[in-house]
Amino acid sequence: MNQMQEIIIDKVVVNIGVGQAGDRLTKAAKVLEMLTGHKPTQTLAKKSVRDFNIRKRLPIGVKVTLRKDDAVNFLNKALYVKDYKIPDYSFDKHGNAYFGISDYTDFKGMKYDPDIGIFGMDVAIVLKRRGGYRIEKRKIGKKTIPSSIRIKKDEAVEFLEKNFKVSVVR
């Protein structure tokens, strides 16, 4: 295989959506920092929802973006929690995978703290090929990514099965 066609992990995004600002948001940030070792950023509401008492640009969640070795290490921990099984519908047509973890105490070494409570999280795995993505980002001569470079769903499944020993439940 061409070295530039090799699939790699671009990033792993871990998100906890709280739905409200305040004390629960700071506790969720503390949980993410304990799990990943990185300081989380706040996510803001895109629009106001009167029924849920949410205003536009109100912080309603926290997320951490992990890259390179940090992403691989966290992904191994998260897949261990899921017993290395991901459902087939978790993959999109661009080769990215998404799954949820219902409780942070499922991770190795994490214990329930009554002061924090229970928080679940969403994990997004973004894959890319080693080369070819610059043509979409550059200023001069910007073009769309050709279909030969785009990652298909079955390639992403094969990558995770081979590198992380994940079984995809169909």
Swiss-Prot record:
GO MF terms here are: rRNA binding; structural constituent of ribosome; tRNA binding
Gene3D superfamilies tied to this protein: 3.30.1440.10
Q: Name one GO biological process term.
A: translation
Q: Record keywords: Cell division included?
A: no
Q: Which family does it belong to?
A: Belongs to the universal ribosomal protein uL5 family.
User: What does this protein's UniProt record list under function?
Assistant: This is one of the proteins that bind and probably mediate the attachment of the 5S RNA into the large ribosomal subunit, where it forms part of the central protuberance. In the 70S ribosome it contacts protein S13 of the 30S subunit (bridge B1b), connecting the 2 subunits; this bridge is implicated in subunit movement. May contact the P site tRNA; the 5S rRNA and some of its associated proteins might help stabilize positioning of ribosome-bound tRNAs.
Q: What is this protein called?
A: Large ribosomal subunit protein uL5
Q: Which organism is it from?
A: Thermoplasma volcanium (strain ATCC 51530 / DSM 4299 / JCM 9571 / NBRC 15438 / GSS1)
